[in-house]
C-alpha cells in the first residue's frame, strides 16, 4: 500500500546485528527502503544483509560502534556514498549487563560506578545521543527525516534488577521528546517504540535457565502480560514502518508506540 511504501528512502539501522534491530532492518527493506546495517559484529551484519538481499531487498553492512562519534561519521560518509543520504534512522543498539543487574548478593550500593556508566552510556549516549548528533543535522538541513528510538517497558515503570538499563531507557524517552520538539520545525520527526518482552541475547539469562526452562521471572512477566506470551521480533516491524513513513505518520512526533502485549496496561 502506498501509505507504507518506503521506496526512495535510505534507512540507517544501528544495532541491526541484533535480533530486534535486525528484524526492523529487514522490515524496512521489504517496504522498499535501502537499508544500511550498522553494528560491531561483521559476521552478523553480513548475514543480515544476505538475508535481506535474498528476499529481494537492498542493503549493505557498515561497521560502526555507536559509542564512537568518529566511527559513526565514517559510516555516515560511506552510507551516503553507497546508498544515498539517510532519511530514516533507527537507534536499536543497547541492552542490559549482568554486571549492573541487582541481585540479593549485589545490591544497588555495590554496583561499581564505572560499570553503571558503561551500561548507561551504551543505552543512552551510544543508543541515541551520538547517532542523533551525527545523522540528525543532515536531516534538518534537508528538511525531512524520521528518527525512531527503541525504548523499553522499563522506561515507563522501572523493573526489578535492571536498574541501570531502566534509568537509561527512561532518559531515552525524555531525549526523544526533546529532539521531537527541537527538530519538528525543521521537518524531522522523532519518535520511539517501546517493546515489551522479546527474547534476545541480552536478556536470555534472565528469562531462561541453563536447561532452557523458564525462570521465575519469565513466569511473572507472562502472568503480567495480558496476551500471555513473549513478542516475536517481526512484531516490531509494523510500528517501525508506520513511524518511518512520511505519508503514514506525517503529523506524528514525540510519540511512543508500545508493542508490549498489554504489559503496561496491566495492574491487578
Give, region by region, the residue ranges found by the protein language model.
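Short C-terminal tail/terminal secondary-structure segment
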Residues: 1-2, 157, 227, 241, ...
Amino acid at each position: 500500500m502506498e501509505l507504507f511504501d518506503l521506496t526512495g528512502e535510505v534507512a540507517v539501522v544501528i544495532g541491526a546485528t541484533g535480533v530486534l534491530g535486525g528484524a526492523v532492518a529487514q522490515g524496512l527493506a521489504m517496504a522498499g527502503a535501502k537499508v544500511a546495517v550498522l553494528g560491531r559484529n561483521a559476521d552478523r551484519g553480513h548475514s543480515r544483509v544476505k538475508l535481506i538481499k535474498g528476499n529481494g531487498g537492498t542493503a549493505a553492512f557498515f561497521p560502526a560502534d555507536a559509542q564512537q562519534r568518529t566511527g559513526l561519521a565514517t559510516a555516515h560518509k560511506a552510507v551516503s556514498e553507497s546508498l544515498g543520504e539517510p532519511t530514516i534512522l533507527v537507534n536499536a543498539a543497547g541492552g542490559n549487563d549482568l554486571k549492573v543487574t541487582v541481585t540479593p548478593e549485589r545490591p544497588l550500593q555495590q554496583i561499581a560506578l564505572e560499570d553503571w556508566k558503561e551500561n548507561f552510556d551504551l543505552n543512552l549516549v551510544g543508543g541515541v545521543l551520538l547517532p542523533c548528533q551525527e545523522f540528525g543535522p543532515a536531516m534538518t538541513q534537508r528538511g525531512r527525516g524520521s528518527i525512531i528510538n527503541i525504548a523499553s517497558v522499563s522506561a515507563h515503570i522501572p523493573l526489578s534488577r535492571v536498574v541501570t538499563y531502566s534509568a537509561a531507557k527512561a532518559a531515552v524517552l525524555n531525549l526523544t521528546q526533546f529532539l521531537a520538539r527541537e527538530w519538528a520545525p525543521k521537518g524531522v520527526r522523532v519518535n520511539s517504540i517501546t517493546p515489551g518482552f522479546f527474547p534476545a541475547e541480552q536478556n536470555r539469562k534472565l528469562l531462561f535457565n541453563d536447561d532452557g526452562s523458564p525462570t521465575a521471572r519469565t513466569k511473572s512477566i507472562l502472568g503480567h502480560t495480558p496476551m500471555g506470551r513473549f513478542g516475536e521480533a517481526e512484531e516490531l516491524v509494523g510500528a517501525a514502518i508506520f513511524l518511518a513513513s512520511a505519508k503514514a505518520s506525517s503529523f506524528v512526533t514525540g510519540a511512543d508506540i508500545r508493542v508490549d502485549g498489554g504489559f503496561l496496561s496491566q495492574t491487578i
